[in-house]
A protein has these predicted regions:
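Coiled-coil dimerization/phosphotransfer module
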Residues: 1-123
Length: 123
């Protein structure tokens, strides 16, 4: 069982909500620091979905194609607030910092049908 799979299972049990991990093909992250930062980004995004978004259905997805790795965390909560850039919270800043540290990009978007999706892309 991968660390992300174990984490989503623990979140599901602890909070009584749907938190799933999907990974169609095994993804090899050969640098421990990169794997740690990806894990922590997922952890922060899931925490935000529960704490701020009220998400009851969270999907953590990891994929790799052509040497690129993508980690996405999607929830069905209230969505990203309009004033998120002015937020005093550190969570988004820390996720951005972690992504930049490993040479990745981080995108946080409000979904048209509600909820938020956080995507970390690493080339």
């Amino acid at each position: 069982m991968s660390a992300l799979e174990q984490y989503t299972s623990e979140v599901q049990d602890l909070f009584g909500l749907s938190c799933r991990f999907e990974c169609d093909m095994p993804v090899l992250v050969d640098q421990e620091a990169v794997a740690n930062h990806l894990y922590r980004i997922a952890q922060e995004a899931v925490n935000n979905a529960i704490k701020h978004g009220g998400g009851r259905d969270i999907l953590v997805k990891l994929s790799a194609e052509g040497g690129n790795i993508a980690l996405s965390i999607r929830d069905n909560g209230v969505g990203l607030p309009e004033n998120v850039r002015a937020s005093k919270g550190m969570g988004l800043h820390i996720m951005n910092y972690r992504a930049k540290t490993i040479g990745a990009t981080l995108q946080v978007q409000r979904c048209p049908d509600g909820g938020t999706v956080v995507t970390c892309s690493l080339q």
